[in-house]
Amino acid sequence: MQYKGYVGSVEFSESDGVFFGKVQGIQSLISYEGRSVQELVDDFHKAVDDYLALCEAEGSEPEMIDNV
């Protein structure tokens, strides 16, 4: 998945019935999950938006993805 220049992984836990992932190519941990594909995508977008808002609030430069 891609959003605002960030790439996210997609995995599935059969035992929990949950899709999950994390943003790739940066050191900060940005994770997300959902019980459906749409929930996963929505949570991925929200996680990236929350990360960018936090960086702005703290006055720090957000990490950008390395060449993945």
Q: Where do the language-model regions lie?
A:
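Short aromatic-glycine-(Arg/Gly/Cys) micro-motifs in beta-strand/loop hairpins
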Residues: 12-27
